[in-house]
Regions:
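Alpha-helix capping and helix-coil boundary motifs
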Residues: 14-17, 45-46, 183, 270-273
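C-terminal helical cap(s) of enzyme catalytic domains, especially alpha/beta-barrels
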Residues: 145-153, 259-292
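A charged helix-plus-loop insertion that forms the helical arch/lid used to bind
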Residues: 85-92
């Protein structure tokens, strides 16, 4: 059940729950960090190279045993705060179409820095499973300026275009400072209860930075206490996960992890994906599962 302001409740439009979209009980989601897209400062104009790299990374993730992936315009810095240009949406849709055709795992879309409408539109067009939204509710001070959540717009757009696309919302998102004094567990509850997010992400301060396990525990406990088993939104750890820390993330209450840097050759964020590193991390997850 989702609770609205004043204690009222309402049924959400039918969206396939995040937990049922993955074959694994504790999914490992890998990042496909797109090179700079056409129209961005660092782009060399080679569209074929962008698509080739995206497909190679997606296939390597799948070959390593990944449970899902997120396609993200990581190379587009400096990022537009929210409304990205139409050509960015077009490029991401074209690449996402090829990626979803090439792999047989759930795919998510993230349009940086915080264009949830664009991400949702791309996801709906290519039949992706979910979107990641950096600031879904609340306000964050970032290097793009002050970003405000637009949950009211995102949910209405999803309903209007009849998209079976789940919303995975960051709480106290990385590369940002939350405005106000809401605790991370309160922020997570508001993302779910008032923002109607289908799942939440807890991250460290930046890309590849370790996530505080205490924060994961607080968010997981808060959602567990408030929600029934059937409706409890999953909690994902969104940065700093490695083969050495993945078991600790699940022990802290995470339901899944999103991994980028640790799956790249040499553990460098901008390098290609290494299938071997993917396999090692998935094996570490599985070894922990078998020990339970």
């Amino acid at each position: 059940m989702i609770y609205l302001a004043g204690g009222a409740s309402a049924a959400m439009p039918t969206v396939t729950p995040l937990r049922t979209r993955f074959d694994a009980d504790r999914p490992v989601i890998g990042m496909v960090h797109l090179p700079p897209l056409p129209g961005t400062p660092a782009c060399d104009g080679d569209r074929d190279a962008v698509r080739t790299r995206a497909l190679e990374d997606a296939r390597r993730l799948e070959a390593g045993g990944i449970d899902g992936l997120v396609l993200e315009n990581f190379g587009d810095a400096p990022f537009h705060p929210d409304d990205v240009p139409k050509h960015t949406v077009a490029e991401m849709t074209a690449v996402a179409t090829e990626v979803t055709d090439a792999v047989d795992v759930p795919v998510g879309i993230n349009v940086l820095r915080n264009d949830a409408d664009a991400a949702l539109s791309v996801a709906a067009a290519v039949d992706a499973d979910f979107v990641r939204v950096n600031v879904h509710v609340g306000t964050a001070a970032t290097d793009q300026g002050v970003l405000e959540g637009r949950a009211h717009e995102t949910l209405r757009l999803r309903d209007r275009i009849d998209a079976d696309v789940a919303i995975l919302a960051d709480v106290h998102v990385k590369h940002a400072t939350p405005v106000g004094d809401r605790s991370i567990d309160r922020a997570a509850l508001e993302a779910v209860e008032r923002g109607r997010a289908d799942g939440v992400i807890v991250s460290g301060p930046g890309t590849g930075a370790e996530t505080a396990l205490e924060a994961v525990e607080r968010v997981a406990d808060a959602l567990s206490e408030r929600c029934s088993d059937d409706s409890e939104p999953p909690v994902f750890v969104g940065s700093g996960v490695t083969t050495d820390t993945v078991a600790d993330c699940f022990a802290a209450g995470a339901d899944g992890v999103i991994v980028g840097t640790a799956l790249k050759e040499g553990a460098e964020t901008t390098n290609p994906v290494s299938s071997e590193r993917v396999g090692d991390l998935v094996a570490a997850r599985d070894a922990d599962s078998s020990a339970d």
